[in-house]
């Protein structure tokens, strides 16, 4: 007989989860900082989104639309989708959690990749299932490695495309091959948080695969190119059976009215989105060229961030660079937890921030 408990105890596995640690926002003793650690857009949200958000403030006593119809319809209109296949949530993180809650349990396995988004592992373990990590090949998802890891216990596969923190992507032909090789009951989750930034002819965010299959879902976010990270707005495109299952456990009012209004206005303002994408493309090229010229190695990125690898020598490692940059007010993201102990991830920021990092790293790399 087990000993009597004298306090509440979480179910097995919960205390084995390493809590997610966001990118830092402040540096002690530094008045002005440039936060380049969370992949936020330097252009901010669309003025139309701000206007819609402000207008919603006059009705805060009213519950929001539990179906988020205005937002779902806006997404459907912009992408040419059926509104019945769209589910919105309090950030795509909530939707990923719902998927795990509904489709995973004790004894199940879910496959993640070596450098994948840390939230996947947290949600999988939170559902009582076991995460199975597969190696990537040169910072790119290896489809053959994923297929080789499938067992009778596999119920879900998570794939960030583009990847975070690598910024690399998997061509649509490889995604199709992955889906075709998975058992039909295994859910393939395509996390396309950075899809709007990709300018590659062989990339497809997931709309096509979801439309033609019953076991594929795609998640997207308004936290990146749309500049609504503070409001927590995400959406999912999935088969109606999966949408129905998630709706059965989803909170009845899981999104605020201001978030719904701002999201709908933001996605309809595609002209503003293109400004953000153009700014990113311009500075991505400049930053990569400059950093490479300094002797740094950069992982090719199609997103809005750059993974910068530092020399393995005293005074020049990523930890040294992080401290050097932080003292000057430039906050990049340490990515040791993603398997890159000697790299930093930099968000493509404003012109002022980008030029500042260039100057700081030029000084850093030139030190004796």
UniProtKB/Swiss-Prot annotation:
Q: Which residues are annotated as modified residue N6-(pyridoxal phosphate)lysine in the UniProt record? A: 224
Q: Give the EC number(s) listed in the UniProt record.
A: 2.6.1.9
Pathway field of the UniProt record reads: Amino-acid biosynthesis; L-histidine biosynthesis; L-histidine from 5-phospho-alpha-D-ribose 1-diphosphate: step 7/9
Reactions accelerated catalytically: L-histidinol phosphate + 2-oxoglutarate = 3-(imidazol-4-yl)-2-oxopropyl phosphate + L-glutamate
Q: Which cofactors does the annotated protein need, by name?
A: pyridoxal 5'-phosphate
Q: Which Pfam families match?
A: Aminotran_1_2 (PF00155)
Q: Kindly list the biological process annotations in GO that this record carries.
A: L-histidine biosynthetic process
The yes or no answer to whether the keyword NADP is present is no
GO molecular function per UniProt: histidinol-phosphate transaminase activity; pyridoxal phosphate binding
The main enzyme category here is transferase
User: What keywords would UniProt list here?
Assistant: Amino-acid biosynthesis, Aminotransferase, Histidine biosynthesis, Pyridoxal phosphate, Transferase
Its assembly, as annotated, is: Homodimer.
According to its UniProt record, which protein family does this protein belong to? Belongs to the class-II pyridoxal-phosphate-dependent aminotransferase family. Histidinol-phosphate aminotransferase subfamily.
- What is the official name of this protein in its record? Histidinol-phosphate aminotransferase
């Amino acid at each position: 007989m087990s000993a009597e408990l004298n306090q509440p105890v979480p179910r097995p596995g919960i205390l084995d989860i390493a809590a997610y640690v966001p990118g830092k926002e402040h540096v002690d003793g530094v008045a002005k900082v440039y936060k380049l650690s969370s992949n936020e857009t330097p252009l901010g949200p669309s003025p139309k989104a701000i206007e819609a958000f402000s207008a919603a403030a006059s009705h805060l006593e009213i519950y929001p639309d539990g179906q988020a119809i205005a937002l779902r319809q806006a997404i459907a209109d912009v992408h040419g989708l059926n509104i019945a296949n769209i589910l919105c949530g309090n950030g795509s993180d909530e939707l990923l959690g719902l998927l795990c809650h509904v489709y995973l349990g004790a004894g199940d396995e879910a496959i993640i990749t070596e450098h994948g988004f840390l939230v996947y592992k947290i949600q999988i373990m939170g559902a009582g299932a076991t995460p199975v990590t597969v190696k990537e090949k040169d910072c790119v998802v290896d489809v053959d490695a994923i297929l080789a890891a499938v067992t009778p216990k596999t119920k879900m596969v998570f794939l960030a495309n583009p990847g975070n923190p690598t910024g690399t992507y998997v061509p649509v032909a490889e995604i199709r091959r992955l889906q075709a090789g998975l058992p039909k009951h295994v859910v393939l989750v395509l996390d396309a948080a950075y899809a709007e930034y990709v300018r590659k002819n062989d990339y497809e965010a997931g709309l096509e695969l979801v439309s033609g299959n019953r076991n594929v879902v795609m998640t997207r976010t308004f936290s990146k190119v749309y500049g609504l990270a503070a409001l927590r707005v995400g959406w999912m495109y999935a088969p109606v059976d999966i949408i129905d299952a998630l709706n059965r456990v989803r909170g009845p009012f899981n999104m605020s009215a201001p978030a719904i209004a701002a999201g709908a206005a933001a996605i309809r303002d595609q002209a503003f989105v293109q400004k953000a994408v153009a700014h990113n493309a311009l500075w991505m090229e400049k930053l990569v060229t400059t950093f490479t010229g300094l002797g740094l190695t950069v992982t090719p990125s199609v997103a809005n961030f750059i993974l910068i690898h530092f020399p393995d020598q005293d005074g020049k490692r990523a930890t040294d660079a992080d401290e050097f940059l932080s003292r000057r007010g430039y906050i990049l993201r340490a990515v040791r937890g993603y398997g890159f102990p000697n790299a930093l991830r930099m968000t493509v920021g404003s012109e002022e921030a980008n030029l500042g990092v260039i100057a700081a790293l030029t000084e850093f790399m030139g030190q004796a």
